[in-house]
């Protein structure tokens, strides 16, 4: 994709993001350099320590476009999945498939606590059978450790006047978007094996494979929407009551 084409796509994409935000008093949690580092570092730390080990787990890096989408959705103060992610070009100017995890708390928010809740679902997941315990959910865990997902963007927002579909009078929403999306039907989250087996030592860092193309064009980044679980079940929420 040329620079001119990329700019054109971005120009079409940005207004759709702005339309997601709702006016009203709320306390924004700034996307500072520290916030970004904590999100990326904690994701990579958890991805590098999966059990069984992963042969193809990609190192995650920050994506400003995914972060803008996550932030915009958190600012709507809605306790539900972002329907725009199911529409091509609405969630990101280049990636066609986007995964999403959401965490809501009425207590003190921290990136580490949110990811701790997501990764805790791993005890319910049977890798060899690629199944979750009956009537349980593991989709946030499997998205977090999805081997092919290598781009990440998160945003958080505090809603003092309440969150739609959240029982508490106020709370904080934390949203992370991933590309390409995980939780693709019939696929394991990653390939079991010795760390970095699929990428070799030249592309290995801390048991994670560095993706050789950090800025893929539209075609190489795309995955069919029909293969992605982008329903409410792929964005399961955890209530944390204090």
Show where each model-derived region lies.
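Mature extracellular or exoplasmic CAP/SCP-family domains and secreted bioactive peptides
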Residues: 2-242
């Amino acid at each position: 994709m040329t620079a001119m084409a990329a700019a054109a796509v971005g120009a079409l994409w940005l207004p759709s993001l702005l339309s997601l935000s709702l006016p009203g008093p709320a306390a924004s949690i700034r996307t500072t350099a520290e916030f970004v580092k904590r999100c990326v570092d904690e994701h990579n730390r958890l991805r590098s320590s999966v059990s069984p080990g992963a042969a193809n787990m990609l190192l995650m890096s920050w994506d400003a476009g995914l972060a803008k989408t996550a932030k915009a959705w958190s600012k709507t103060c809605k306790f539900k999945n972002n329907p725009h992610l199911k529409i091509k070009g609405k969630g990101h100017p280049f990636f066609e498939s986007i995964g999403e995890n959401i965490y809501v708390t009425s207590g003190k928010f921290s990136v580490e606590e949110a990811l701790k809740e997501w990764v805790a679902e791993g005890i319910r997941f049977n890798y060899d059978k690629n199944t979750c315990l009956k009537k349980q959910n593991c989709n946030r865990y499997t998205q977090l450790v999805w081997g092919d997902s290598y781009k990440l963007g998160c945003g958080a927002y505090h809603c003092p006047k309440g969150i739609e579909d959240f029982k508490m009078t106020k709370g904080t929403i934390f949203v992370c978007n991933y590309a390409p999306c995980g939780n693709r039907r019939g696929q394991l989250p990653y390939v079991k094996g010795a760390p970095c087996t699929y990428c070799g030592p030249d592309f290995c860092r801390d048991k994670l494979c560095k993706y050789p193309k950090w800025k893929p064009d539209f075609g190489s980044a795309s995955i069919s929407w029909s293969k992605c679980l982008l329903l409410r079940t792929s964005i399961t929420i955890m209530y944390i009551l204090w």
